[in-house]
Amino acid sequence: VTFSFDGDPDFISFFSGEIGHEYKHRNRIEMQPEDVEKCEINFSIVYDYGNAKTIEGSTHILISDQFGGISGNNVEKDKEAVTNCDWTELVSQEDLPKATKVTKDYSCPLTSYLGKEISIAFRLNPLDNSATMPVIHIKGLQLNLEFNNGKSTTINAKNFEFSALNVTYNLDDLSKNNTHLTKLKEALGNKNLTLEEMKSAEYADKIAYTTVDGNIPYFWRISQPNDFVTSGGSKDYTKGDTWLISNPILLNGSCDPDAGVAIKNISQTLEIYSHTYEEAGTYTATFVANNANYVHQGGQV
């Protein structure tokens, strides 16, 4: 299509009317629910160690639009908030892996949560310790939104701002493996801590929120965003309860405004302009003409 012009404005921008280039959406920064074609969270789960008995019922993948987040400075209040929150199982127990070394991929739709603040939680709470308990890997976590204007948004794991809440753990069990205990000491910032010091009230509050750089029982490793890990521990270890919970995320379909194309500036002349539409259809083509200098700016659509 070729367009002809009269006059000589300083600047002209062109909105073709195609998806992503509609003048009516030039100021839009948030999609409406009806504009969202897909909203889903994707991740994989695989277990190391454990058996069918210790794996069963050990894991919960949860979502809530009622959780206000982890404070990080009041353990009892945070435990109460997590316990009393109305969580929904994002993945049913029947759909979780039943054995080790079996990777399962999940794509969970979240369209019903559009416009709400959601928190995602991963919880390891083994019910059976008659054998080695599972090590769980949460891999490739992403939140994906696709819009009807052809654009998309991806939120990666590191942008979820996860916090740990270690509700139940046993330092005596952890001390049976010196490497495991050392990893926790490193996470606490003091490799010279004694076991008794770690059991003190001072460190109990710190340990409740601690993540570690290693694969040890009772604590999450989140230093590798594409592979969150925690472990249940050896046979007869205390059955732990450890959570990894995201900050609330607003599912508002944020998007970039539709953009026009600058086809003329003050140093150019323009009498005709051609644009090729790749698909047949009805489009509203819009030209925005502006004159501007240091004392005045005006325009016409």
Predicted regions and their residues:
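Extracellular beta-strand-rich recognition modules
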Residues: 39-49, 57-59, 63, 116-126, ...
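Residue-level signature of extracellular beta-strand-rich folds
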Residues: 3-6, 14-15, 273-275, 287
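Residue-level recognition of secondary-structure-to-loop junctions
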Residues: 267, 271-279, 283
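Long, low-complexity, polar/charged, intrinsically disordered or flexibly structured peripheral segments
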Residues: 205-262
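Short, solvent-exposed loop/turn segments at the edges of extracellular beta-sandwich modules
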Residues: 128-130, 290-296
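Extracellular carbohydrate recognition and processing domains
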Residues: 75-113
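Aromatic sugar-binding surface patches on proteins
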Residues: 99-105, 251-271
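Exposed low-complexity, polar/acidic, P/S/T/G-rich flexible segments that act as propeptides
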Residues: 130-185
